[in-house]
């Protein structure tokens, strides 16, 4: 009897210190969590949009498109050209040629303004091009009256390149949205892995505490030895589970680190003591979804890209229609011996309607098979694009509604899961009370507790799934949710 009282005293002291130790350990854990840096979704947003290589690469798309516009503007750059040739043989000057011209392409009517100076002298110079020693100055225009009057290749190229700036901007937004969506999914996977680890770790702590308590009662003879064995098995099972989720947490942290870069373009790694922000499932109103659908119809990157292609094909179609016209180019120049404005030149050698040079060029393919075939090809591409635009708009709208339905399903499931967790906690508490009275078994307590942990893990999985579905809702609408 005396030994039994001593054993009871030792067990009471052991349980007292265990409870104190667990309380201290819990306080220390809370202190660590409090002191650890909370890596919020807003922090991730700052890293991604500021330093992510793909985001920086996407910005180059718009720069490249503007570079193409600049390149297309080069077709309208004024050009200066000159040529000189001279031949002397046997004390005779066969020819002395000097030709120079400033050509200024004009947007209007596809014309070219030409200012030139020619000096062709010598004993054997062609009479058609022979000039006086002072040479001839000419100012004139080259105008296409048929093909190229409404639109030509250089105007078509410039217009198309300007439209492609909008295409490139839409592609930039699309790539940035994709990067952010993947980052958000990885963040909530990390959140789930972290919460799962916390819950399983708490389960290990509870199982160890129960094992020590049951072992003490077994020594006193109040509990059969098999209960101690069962409690130890539960501890080991949960430790195995803890090691598994520990690896999952490490992997999730590494995957999230893929999105972290410094401002010096060096990769960063998420600190081990970093913890995710607290999360809950907030309700999404149907009004928000309707707004996203309307916004997607106007601004979704895929639709913007298709509309840009449609505009590009419309310009190409106009150009191909222009190619069906005959080519009629008229050139004309007013001529003068004047080399500068401060020199005297007789009126009959100065600029006037009696001193000119004019030319006409005409060509027209009889069957126009190449031109008609190209125009037909452009029309077919336009029809294909119209069908693609129609289908893409419908798919985007249905994708947004699908994400909304997923969110509503998560809301309902979470509400039920939270109630079930409350009920399970009541069951566990009641089972523990029955066990203390000797009316239950350790197996039932472990089962109730394991079920509770599984339900809590499932709740965190639902919360993470809800947050990923919310990010997917905005992504499928062609935008993203700011974390301000």
What is each PLM-predicted segment?
Residues 27-36, 83-143, 274-285, 318, ...:
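Small/polar, glycine/serine/threonine/aspartate-rich low-complexity segments that form flexible
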Residues 15-24:
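C-terminal segment of classical bacterial N-terminal signal peptides
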Residues 1-10:
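Bacterial N-terminal signal peptides that target proteins for export
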């Amino acid at each position: 009897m005396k030994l039994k009282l001593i054993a009871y005293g030792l067990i009471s002291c052991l349980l007292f210190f265990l409870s104190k130790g667990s309380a201290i350990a819990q306080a220390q854990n809370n202190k660590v969590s409090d002191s650890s840096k909370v890596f919020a979704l807003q922090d991730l947003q700052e890293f991604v949009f500021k330093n992510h290589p793909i985001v920086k690469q996407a910005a180059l798309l718009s720069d490249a498109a503007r570079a193409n516009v600049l390149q297309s503007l080069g077709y309208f750059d004024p050009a200066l050209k000159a040529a000189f040739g001279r031949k002397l043989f046997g004390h005779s000057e066969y020819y002395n040629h000097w030709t120079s011209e400033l050509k200024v392409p004009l947007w209007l009517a596809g014309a070219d303004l030409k200012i030139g100076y020619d000096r062709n002298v010598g004993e054997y110079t062609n009479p058609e091009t022979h000039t006086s020693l002072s040479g001839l100055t000419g100012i004139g225009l080259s105008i296409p009256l048929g093909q190229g009057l409404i639109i030509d290749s250089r105007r078509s190229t410039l217009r198309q390149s300007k439209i492609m700036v909008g295409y490139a901007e839409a592609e930039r937004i699309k790539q940035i949205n994709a990067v952010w969506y993947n980052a958000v999914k990885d963040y909530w996977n990390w959140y789930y892995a972290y919460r799962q680890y916390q819950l399983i770790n708490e389960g290990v702590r509870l199982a160890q505490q129960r094992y020590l308590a049951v072992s003490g009662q077994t020594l006193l003879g109040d509990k059969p030895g098999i209960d101690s064995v069962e409690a130890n098995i539960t501890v080991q099972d949960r430790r195995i589970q803890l090691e598994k989720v520990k690896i999952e947490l490490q992997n999730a942290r590494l995957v999230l680190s893929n999105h972290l870069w410094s401002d010096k373009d060096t990769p960063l790694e998420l600190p081990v003591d970093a913890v995710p922000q607290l999360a809950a499932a907030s309700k999404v109103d149907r009004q928000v979804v309707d707004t996203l659908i309307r916004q997607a119809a106007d601004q979704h990157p895929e639709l913007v890209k298709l509309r840009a292609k449609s505009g590009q094909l419309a310009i190409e179609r106009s150009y191909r229609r222009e190619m069906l016209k005959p080519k009629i180019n008229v050139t004309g120049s007013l001529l003068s011996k004047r080399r500068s404005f401060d020199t005297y030149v007789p009126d009959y050698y100065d600029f006037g309607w009696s001193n000119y040079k004019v030319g006409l060029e005409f060509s027209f393919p009889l069957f126009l098979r190449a031109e008609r075939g190209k125009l037909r090809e452009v029309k077919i591409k336009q029809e294909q694009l119209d069908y693609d635009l129609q289908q893409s708009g419908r798919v985007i709208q249905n994708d947004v509604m699908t994400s909304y339905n997923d969110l509503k399903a998560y809301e309902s499931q979470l509400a039920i899961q939270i109630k079930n967790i409350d009920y399970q906690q009541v069951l566990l508490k009641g089972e523990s009370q029955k066990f203390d009275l000797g009316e239950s078994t350790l197996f039932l307590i472990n089962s109730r507790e394991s079920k509770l942990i599984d339900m809590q893990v499932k709740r965190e999985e639902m919360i993470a799934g809800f947050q990923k579905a919310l990010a997917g809702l905005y992504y499928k609408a062609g935008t993203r949710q700011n974390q301000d």
